Curated annotation (Swiss-Prot):
Organism, scientific name: Xenopus laevis
A GO molecular-function descriptor: DNA binding
Tissue specificity statement from the Swiss-Prot or TrEMBL entry: At the late gastrula stage, expressed in the presumptive ventrolateral mesoderm. During neurulation and tailbud stages, expressed in the lateral plate mesoderm and in the neural crest-derived structures of the head and branchial arches. During tailbud stages, expressed in the pronephros and pronephros ducts and in cells that migrate from the dorsolateral plate to the ventral region of the embryo (with the notable exception of the heart). These cells may represent hematopoietic or endothelial progenitor cells.
Record's protein name: Forkhead box protein F1-B
CDD domains: FH_FOXF1 (cd20049)
Parts of the chain that traverse the membrane: none
Localization, UniProt: Nucleus
Database matches in SMART domains: FH
Gene: foxf1-b
Amino acid sequence: MTAEIQQPPSQPPAQSSPMSAATDKHGGQPSAMESASCATKTKKTNAGIRRPEKPPYSYIALIVMAIQSSPTKRLTLSEIYQFLQSRFPFFRGSYQGWKNSVRHNLSLNECFIKLPKGLGRPGKGHYWTIDPASEFMFEEGSFRRRPRGFRRKCQALKPMYSMMNGLGFNHIPDTYSFQGASGTISCPPNSLSLDSGIGMMNGHLPSNVDGMGLSGHSVSHLTANGAHSYMGSCTGASGGDYSHHDSGSPLLGGGVMDPHSVYSSPASAWAPSASTPYIKQQPLSPCNTAANPLSSSLSSHSLDQSYLHQNSHNTASELQGIPRYHSQSPSMNDRKEFVFSFNAMASSSMHSGSGSYYHQQVGYQDIKPCVM
């Protein structure tokens, strides 16, 4: 009897899936993908970690700290980098933008000076030090900021300020000094006269020649009835107090101020005489007499008295010269009149309670240009 040997059923070969086949063909691919995913997880983990906090100092202060820490008080750019990295953890990280900030502050700020490199020193890199003129900014650890060019602008403006003060544009509040209760007004001889100021404004004229032929100042006070006529003249060369001694006549009662363009004498002796005649001078203006028929009548006359107290028979017709507004001369209306008021104090403020009148230089001028 033959024994049947039962063989175990042969197991079918395991069917390989397409993924497994791909895995067999590309054996290294799973490891590469796993490394990429691990790197992504690492980045996400590092993103949650904050970098060290920035030092509570400006870059100017940090650079000054680095330079002052050196015995020679000078450092190269790389040495400044090393000092900051060794001192503050913020500069040890992956962020490198702070180096640009250090370079910009060194080159753009005026308190840092780049020293020339010596001939015996090879390699590149200049030494940087602190400007001696700016050391006061960093005394006792005070790192105060200053705008770039602050001191240079101030030094550049100093000559202009001194020139403006030398011209005496602020002479109006300085030349008038009210002394006590008498109301005395003083006129210093060294004050800037009006003609010199106009000559400076003209620019093209020499200092000894007035642009419009003005060499003095005159103001005529005419009352409404023509009974009293006061005319005062004051030049920059005379420096006394000029007073009117008649305490009975009111100066400002219904008076009309009529400024005239005059050529006054440079020196004056003030006398209270009422019979002193007018002194006529030749005009200094280079006007053509033939082209301007009014030049002869417009040649002004100066009065060397402080105030002339005339009687009632001395009317305004006796005054030589043409008023500013004259009805009989139509050509005067065609001419343009330029009035320069360099004095803010009118003659109305010169009235004192005791009846003694002190008159000072009044700068109302009529500049009548020549009609060519």
